[in-house]
């Protein structure tokens, strides 16, 4: 007699296969999305860290220069009408302008960076200038440059000066003057060689530097702020009218 053997082994149905593929796709999409999120988070953190380090180094350099500022007083300082004809500008003048997005600042400091073969032995004083220009490689990027020149009479914006930081979206200065602390005034520009300023220098300066993330230039920039009270200063000449 023949026996009928029942086969209880079943294969997957098409519906089950499709459901499995669908669930697998969901899992892989979730994993990939998490990976991409982690990758961009790490990359953003690294960019922020680099931007912060760059801005901090620039501010530290400015503080060092300004804390070593050279300010002359009479009789070394002479008003324009008492100077030789070939010496129209005071080589130790303090000049700054901050009426737009990007300020300029020029002064003389003991914080000269000595370079062998180009600097006098033992260092010396140099004119320091901070200014913002377009990057030579990318005109959409603004960079903060620092000029350091022992020739106090030569112009100091040759556009080949070292770059302190990139992706600058703001560089602003506020010049603070007072003779009594209850009469503090702030200015957006200053020229210690100007009769209107009565040949004085500021007592302090406030600095704001804004740097953007190169990948997100339109978002909120990283803002650095500090201030310096000058160890030396020249008060307004009361005799100047």
Where are these regions (language model features)?
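Short, solvent-exposed loop/turn segments that connect beta-strands within catalytic domains
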Residues: 135-141, 153-157, 180-184, 215-220
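Extracytoplasmic beta-strand-rich oligomerization domains located immediately C-terminal to a leader/signal peptide
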Residues: 34-156
